[in-house]
């Protein structure tokens, strides 16, 4: 009986510890995005468009004067081809989440949705969201949609995985979320289980560079990984994402930023 009691106490303490770590990751991400309460726009004609973001809020100065900003144009002739960057190691779990709308439609995980491992550092998955059209361009060309999967390490460093889409067959991950997106009335909707493992990469090849968050406060030092495979999404799915964006900016892609001498890699194992 004593063994069972100790086991129970150990289970409770372990659960509390894991919960506190998860809350740390979520609150760290939220603290970087709390300034979204300050209005900004994707339309330059409003005076609050992307070119003016750095002047709207003192905490957003990097949006205007940063030297490692995102997104960028990935130009084939400028890429450094590498076979040693390493496989992107994913370990995702289904977890409870909240579907939210604002400047974009997003899924914010409340439970432990798993992590990725980049160069020996673990980054917890906290959120994903969509931009229309794609934010990153490829030799100057944009795609119809881009998904960003946002991860945070224990020391508050960020890593984002980007996946671009062209029109074609429906995307399986969006198909599972589609009923919730279509019925999203208020600012958010609880979803019992969302499995980030349903997001398909389709290729081990990827682009890599150091950039920033692509929305205010445009925090720099973000590790960007853009999957090489172009996935497909249906027109109906993209239309649903655009219709539910709260502020009416159906095109919510920041213009590409200057490279400022940064290296861009292409991992080809």
Task: Label each residue range with its predicted role.
Residues 2-269:
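Alpha-carbonic anhydrase
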């Amino acid at each position: 009986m004593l063994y069972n009691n100790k086991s129970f106490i150990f289970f409770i303490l372990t659960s509390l510890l894991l919960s506190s770590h998860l809350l740390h990751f979520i609150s760290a991400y939220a603290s970087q995005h709390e300034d979204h309460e300050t209005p900004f726009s994707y339309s330059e004609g409003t005076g609050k468009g992307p070119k003016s973001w750095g002047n709207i809020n003192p905490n957003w100065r990097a949006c205007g004067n940063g030297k490692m900003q995102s997104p960028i144009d990935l130009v084939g002739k400028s890429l450094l081809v590498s076979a040693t960057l390493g496989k992107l190691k994913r370990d995702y779990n289904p977890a409870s989440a909240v579907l939210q709308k604002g400047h974009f439609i997003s899924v914010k995980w409340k439970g432990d949705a798993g992590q990725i491992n980049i160069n020996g550092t673990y980054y917890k998955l906290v959120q994903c969201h969509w931009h229309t059209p794609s934010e990153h361009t490829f030799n100057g060309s944009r795609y119809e949609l881009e998904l960003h999967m946002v991860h945070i390490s224990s020391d508050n460093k960020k890593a984002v995985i980007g996946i671009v889409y062209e029109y074609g067959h429906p995307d399986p991950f969006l198909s599972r979320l589609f009923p919730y997106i279509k019925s999203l009335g208020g600012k958010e909707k609880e979803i019992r289980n969302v499995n980030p493992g349903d997001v398909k990469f389709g290729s081990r090849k990827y682009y890599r560079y150091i950039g920033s968050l692509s929305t205010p406060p445009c925090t720099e030092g973000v590790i960007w990984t853009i999957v090489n495979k172009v996935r497909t999404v249906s027109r109906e799915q993209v239309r649903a994402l655009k219709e539910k964006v709260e502020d009416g900016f159906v095109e919510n892609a920041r213009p590409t930023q200057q490279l400022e001498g940064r290296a861009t890699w292409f991992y080809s194992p």
